[in-house]
Amino acid sequence: MTYLADCQGPCSAFSGSTGDVWVKIHQAGYDPDRAAADGGTPWASKRLPEQNSTWTVALPATLRHGQYVLRHEILGLQRTNTDGNLAQFYPACHQIAVTGTGTAALPAGIALPGAYRPDDTTSVSFFFLLLFFSFLSCFIIIL
């Protein structure tokens, strides 16, 4: 998942820990079409090492120029629900400067920290629900 926050000036004076400033601009997860199309892995986390541990994200073309913090986050589900463990989040933040002629401001986003709770199983439940419906749709197509 990739989030973007507008620093509203120099990022040295910005605190991303208050307010709903983080806007999700990209996400990648389970993609069954990728496996069917080229025999590759459907999991984004498995594709990452195949891409030399790099990930490309396109910024919105209409985004106004300015200073931003880009937060890329890997969500680890490998130990979820084992021994009471929940999903693992691995964030990394980068200060970036956007140049160009765009004039669009970011919409309201979410608060980080605050959007996730240690006892929140929503991401895990949604993950299994997604797998269930993916399986169900495949099952219906086969019939």
Regions found by a protein language model. Give the residues of each.
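Peripheral, solvent-exposed domain-edge segments
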Residues: 1-54, 77-143
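Short acidic/polar micro-motifs centered on Gly/Asp/Asn
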Residues: 58-59, 76
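A glycine-anchored, Pro-Gly-centered beta-turn/N-cap motif
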Residues: 59, 64-66
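A short tyrosine-centered beta-strand micro-motif
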Residues: 68-72
